[in-house]
Amino acid sequence: MTTKIFKRIIVFAVIALSSGNILAQSSSITRKDFDHINLEYSGLEKVNKAVAAGNYDDAAKALLAYYREKSKAREPDFSNAEKPADIRQPIDKVTREMADKALVHQFQPHKGYGYFDYGKDINWQMWPVKDNEVRWQLHRVKWWQAMALVYHATGDEKYAREWVYQYSDWARKNPLGLSQDNDKFVWRPLEVSDRVQSLPPTFSLFVNSPAFTPAFLMEFLNSYHQQADYLSTHYAEQGNHRLFEAQRNLFAGVSFPEFKDSPRWRQTGISVLNTEIKKQVYADGMQFELSPIYHVAAIDIFLKAYGSAKRVNLEKEFPQSYVQTVENMIMALISISLPDYNTPMFGDSWITDKNFRMAQFASWARVFPANQAIKYFATDGKQGKAPNFLSKALSNAGFYTFRSGWDKNATVMVLKASPPGEFHAQPDNGTFELFIKGRNFTPDAGVFVYSGDEAIMKLRNWYRQTRIHSTLTLDNQNMVITKARQNKWETGNNLDVLTYTNPSYPNLDHQRSVLFINKKYFLVIDRAIGEATGNLGVHWQLKEDSNPVFDKTKNRVYTTYRDGNNLMIQSLNADRTSLNEEEGKVSYVYNKELKRPAFVFEKPKKNAGTQNFVSIVYPYDGQKAPEISIRENKGNDFEKGKLNLTLTINGKQQLVLVP
């Protein structure tokens, strides 16, 4: 091979590898590229002059110089990010891996799955797992921010060159209107809002790169404007999606005030949030989707929006009632928080990192410096004061907390008996989580997956079943209605009582009473009321490592933790009730599951008569399960809710009176 031929091959290869980037930046700049820019905006005088003279290349150069100066004067704004980044901290391994794999087009759209190779010529329509979240979240392009952070830390231009290429490639291959199927994933407003939120700090970190040319600047700005403007007229009808989208559109208007439409983006965002906070937040402070994890997200959304408005002196556009509602939401969160800072995994929720949650409380404490309870949670109890309540009912949302204290060894049960929820709600009224001395003995099932093809939906629906929650079923069927009515909520020094009724099935109401006795243990009375007949079951779930003993002779199940922190659940029914093991699973994080112990107390309902289940949930220290029995005294009337019972626990009697 001659030297001349070899050189031609090398030149051709370089051109081929860079073709996407060259195509993206070789297009001529025209007057139309500046249509969305407010050329009268302070700082754009040179841009305005060049545009007026028809020197569009010079105008683009001046605009790039403006943004570069702006980036040097102000740090990238991560205030609206899901997890704010600190550019002064070393790059962690996860971020570095994400950025490096992105260089070879290996992307991780969703944390619940690994990395997928999308090809040298990126296939943005590839759907490696038929989970909708994988296809949706591909277009949140979260690795772009990782690339920007690594670029900032290393100065290695390969990250900037690749990002410019990928952005142009993505924009070219995913135009609005490409197809109904593609639009459903790329242009779903939630994904658009995610990009609108993450792109401003990414832009700021890359804008000083030589790879960031004036031509690419105009391409980027026109693309960003299209996305933000589309978002402003396509908010979701309701729910947390609508909140996310409004907050992020406001952020777009704050991040790029140079756009003519930025004031409208800000105002529509503020207007939607002012309206939705009244619709979506119950008087007790809970967000109406009844999912603790999305409740926390709503708090962040409302306060991030408020912070964005403050940056441009628009905070007065939010009335005082808005701020007060958010504070009430934080107090509701505190009420249902467990001692490890987690919340129950009701309604598609999952566990969270304690330090991350404390950081959230710290950010909220800056908005509400006078609230001592928020400060207490922000500092792990080192500052501020513990809340001035223990057991608390959030009666509108139907979240009830029984609590012995605020220390790490407290006994805390959070029970759900709610009105109908939205997409994330499950048919699970009556289910609960019980946390004792640092251990969650009865974690809720969790979510596992959201939506997708038939195989994915089968996985999701398994976790939605009523029978895999700690509540009552008829013939193991899902409850048809979740519309609990609170009958009684009383708290006292030695006895807290909840009674609610839920119309779970046609012709069958489930009434559950929970008694928290001596701030230590629980008596649970379930009543199946109505004409329906079939097999009744009261289901229970335990932690995956509890290694329980199933004592069918005494109708009890007890854990065997070696540290002596144990729990017994026993049926105290006088009539025949059978104890049976069931399949149990729990999902603490997306697409990850563990087997766990589960069981049910069962008996038939043969006629219209009411059937009762009486169970005791008893924490104890040591390896020997307690001996417990019950006696109904004169005047005890389950039907009227009047209780007169004597519990005998290891030979000691405890009178239980509820008038």
UniProtKB/Swiss-Prot annotation:
GO terms for cellular component: periplasmic space. Its EC number is 4.2.2.8. Residues 1-24 form the signal peptide. Keywords: Lyase, Periplasm, Signal. It catalyses: Elimination of sulfate, appears to act on linkages between N-acetyl-D-glucosamine and uronate. Product is an unsaturated sugar. InterPro entries: Chondroitin_lyas, Hepar_II_III_C, Hepar_II_III_N, HepC. Its main location: periplasm. Gene3D superfamilies: 2.70.98.70, Chondroitin AC/alginate lyase (1.50.10.100). SUPFAM superfamilies: Chondroitin AC/alginate lyase. Disulfide bonds: none annotated. Pfam families: Hepar_II_III_C (PF07940), Hepar_II_III_N (PF16889). GO terms for molecular function: heparin-sulfate lyase activity. One of its GO terms (biological process) is heparan sulfate proteoglycan catabolic process. It is found in: Periplasm. The active site is at 294 (proton acceptor). It comes from the Bacteria. It is an enzyme of class 4 (lyase). Belongs to the polysaccharide lyase 12 family. PANTHER family: HEPARIN-SULFATE LYASE. Specifically cleaves heparan sulfate-rich regions of acidic polysaccharides. Does not act on N,O-desulfated glucosamine or N-acetyl-O-sulfated glucosamine linkages. Functions in cleaving metazoan heparan sulfate and providing carbon, nitrogen and sulfate sources for microorganisms. This is Heparin-sulfate lyase. It comes from Pedobacter heparinus (strain ATCC 13125 / DSM 2366 / CIP 104194 / JCM 7457 / NBRC 12017 / NCIMB 9290 / NRRL B-14731 / HIM 762-3).
